[in-house]
């Protein structure tokens, strides 16, 4: 799988992320993708070949392996990374759409466009507010959901996070209960616990970032509400002054007309 392309795409999202989001991307790249590519694929590369059962019954070994490992650990982690990274791509698409609209306004010569050239639009960092805030917050929520679902699926599918040394299988077509052995169970257990721990750290970072965004959102709303409370009073004063001026002008005009008619 081409993880470099995924890193390039998510690297663009890093520019528009919060500080916590940048830490999450760092953990994702270094402790998950790099470990998955460099080490985990080698550890699980021989899992089916070195899965040994003490029977010569044709098909028994394959059935037992499928029973204990319906999905390979390495493939499940790769699928998890794809699902967890997909919401961040929504943010990248939203930013690309905003940038495209800015470029279109610039080319049309719109007076509302405050940019000097296309390069300034291309390198602009958008603030997380408005519709981008909703997109970014929804992406974090779905990341949390995907992380939690995959951790539960992992625990449920493999009956825990430890790799047993001995597995007893009695599935058909095995003639009786046979003993099956996994290669490098301790090493695989260490990698499994490490990946689960990193996934838990990512969940905590997502929760912290979600709380941070919600706090900023409500503070911004309360600040706007406070400004709106003071702003109407200011508008009322301005309207009162304007009405007084209009009355003075109206009275002066009436006096002028009366004086003109009387003369």
Swiss-Prot record:
It is a multi-pass membrane protein. The gene is GJB6. Exclusively expressed in the cochlea of the inner ear, where it is found in cells of the tegmentum vasculosum, cuboidal cells, supporting cells and clear cells. A connexon is composed of a hexamer of connexins. Keywords: Cell junction, Cell membrane, Gap junction, Hearing, Membrane, Transmembrane, Transmembrane helix. One of its GO terms (molecular function) is gap junction channel activity. The chain crosses the membrane at residues 20-40, 76-96, 138-158, 190-210. One of its GO terms (biological process) is gap junction-mediated intercellular transport. GO terms for cellular component: connexin complex. Belongs to the connexin family. Beta-type (group I) subfamily. The lineage of its organism: Eukaryota, Metazoa, Chordata, Craniata, Vertebrata. Residues 41-75, 159-189 are extracellular. This is Gap junction beta-6 protein. It is found in: Cell membrane; Cell junction, Gap junction. Residues 1-19, 97-137, 211-263 are cytoplasmic. InterPro entries: Connexin (IPR000500), Connexin_CCC (IPR019570), Connexin_CS (IPR017990), Connexin_N (IPR013092), Connexin_N_sf (IPR038359). The keyword Transmembrane applies.
């Amino acid at each position: 799988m081409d993880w470099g392309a995924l890193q390039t795409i998510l690297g663009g999202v890093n520019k528009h992320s919060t500080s916590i989001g940048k830490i999450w991307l760092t953990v994702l790249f270094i402790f998950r993708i790099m470990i998955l590519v460099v080490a985990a694929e080698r550890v699980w590369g021989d899992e089916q070949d070195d899965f040994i059962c003490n029977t010569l019954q044709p098909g028994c070994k394959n059935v037992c392996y499928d029973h204990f490992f319906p999905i390979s650990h390495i493939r499940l982690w790769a699928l998890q990374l794809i699902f967890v990274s997909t919401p961040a791509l929504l943010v990248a698409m939203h930013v690309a759409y905003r940038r495209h609209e800015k470029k279109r306004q610039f080319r049309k010569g719109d007076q509302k466009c405050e940019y000097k050239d296309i390069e300034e639009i291309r390198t602009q960092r958008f603030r997380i507010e408005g519709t981008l805030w909703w997109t970014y917050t929804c992406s974090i929520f779905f990341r949390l959901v995907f992380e939690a679902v995959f951790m539960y699926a992992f625990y449920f599918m493999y009956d825990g996070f430890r790799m047993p040394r001995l597995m007893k299988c009695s599935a058909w077509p095995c003639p009786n209960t046979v003993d099956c052995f996994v290669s490098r169970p301790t090493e695989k257990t260490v990698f499994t616990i490490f990946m689960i721990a990193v996934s838990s750290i990512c969940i905590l970072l997502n929760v912290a970032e979600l709380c941070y965004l919600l706090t900023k959102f409500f503070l911004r709303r309360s600040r706007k509400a406070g400004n709106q409370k003071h702003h109407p009073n200011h508008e009322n004063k301005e309207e009162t002054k304007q009405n007084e001026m209009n009355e003075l002008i109206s009275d002066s005009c009436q006096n002028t007309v009366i004086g003109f008619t009387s003369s």
